[in-house]
A protein has these predicted regions:
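Conserved class I S-adenosyl-L-methionine
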Residues: 114, 133, 140, 147-175
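Class I SAM-dependent methyltransferase Rossmann-like catalytic core
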Residues: 1-32
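A conserved beta-strand element that flanks and buttresses the S-adenosyl-L-methionine
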Residues: 102
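Core SAM-dependent methyltransferase catalytic element
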Residues: 213-230
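Short catalytic micro-motifs in class I SAM-dependent methyltransferases
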Residues: 105-109
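A short, conserved alpha-helix within the catalytic core of class I
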Residues: 110-142
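Class I SAM-dependent methyltransferase SAM/SAH-binding core
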Residues: 40, 45-90
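Short alpha-helix
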Residues: 190-210
Length: 230
């Protein structure tokens, strides 16, 4: 086993598992989960989060993602309804169709077209275009969900979770960020694409002004932000 695998399995994986269990506790403590309700998991990948929250329920749960491969597992292995989304952020359901909309570490990726990620090197342009799409995505969540739970990593936490790297690099001009990510992807313990735009507390409150905002802590510091409407 090489050093990168050892670090991932011995340090980051146990930390991530503890963090996910903590997040499930927050969900159960703040959302009145309806056993027979309709639930939408936006960016739900293979559906593992829903399986951990509702181990005996598949009916009425919809998993959406932009990955056909992930949705194939969600449908054929885990038994969920699946919807393939495009990158626009539009959700193809009528108003208040779902009793609960769930989104975990997704909205920060609702930014620009994936094929333009490396081409947009202006920090201002990327932020403005990203925030416009994130705003539309947030409005869609509020439109289709009676209740919602939306989580996103906090921009000013000490470690940037997509790269597992000190978050100071986020304050560099985007052009340099892209070069740094390309360089680190050659050997670093975690690879990523510069397709994400992390949110500040004010950004997040602006997107979900009607919601209760929870600051999820790690080592006494705010690690992620959660918007809850119950």
């Amino acid at each position: 086993m090489n050093l990168k695998k050892i670090i991932r399995q011995k340090i980051f994986k146990p930390y991530s598992l503890r963090y996910e269990k903590s997040k499930n506790k927050i969900i159960k403590a703040n959302i009145d989960l309806i056993p027979n309700g309709k639930i939408l998991d936006l960016g739900g990948n293979t559906g593992e989060r829903m399986k951990s929250l509702f181990p005996n329920k598949t009916e009425g749960i919809y998993i959406t993602d932009i990955s056909e491969k992930a949705l194939d597992v969600a449908k054929n292995h885990n038994g969920y309804n699946t919807i393939l989304l495009d990158e626009s952020g539009n959700i193809p359901f009528e108003d208040k169709y779902f009793d609960l909309v769930f989104s975990n570490s997704v909205i920060e990726h609702v930014t620009v077209d994936k094929n333009q990620v490396y081409n947009i090197t202006s920090t201002k342009t990327f932020k403005e275009q990203s925030l416009a799409r994130q705003s539309r995505f947030a409005e869609e969540i509020k439109r289709v969900g009676k209740k919602y739970f939306v989580q996103t990593p906090y921009k000013h936490f000490i470690v940037e979770s997509h790269l597992w790297f000190p978050s100071l690099y986020l304050y560099l001009p985007r052009k340099i960020q892209i070069k740094l990510i390309r360089f680190l992807n050659k050997f670093w313990i975690k690879r990523t694409s510069p397709d994400f735009s992390l949110l500040t507390i004010n950004d997040f409150k602006g997107l979900f002004s009607e919601a209760k905002i929870i600051k999820e802590k790690s080592f006494f510091l705010t690690k992620s932000l959660i918007a809850i409407k119950n």
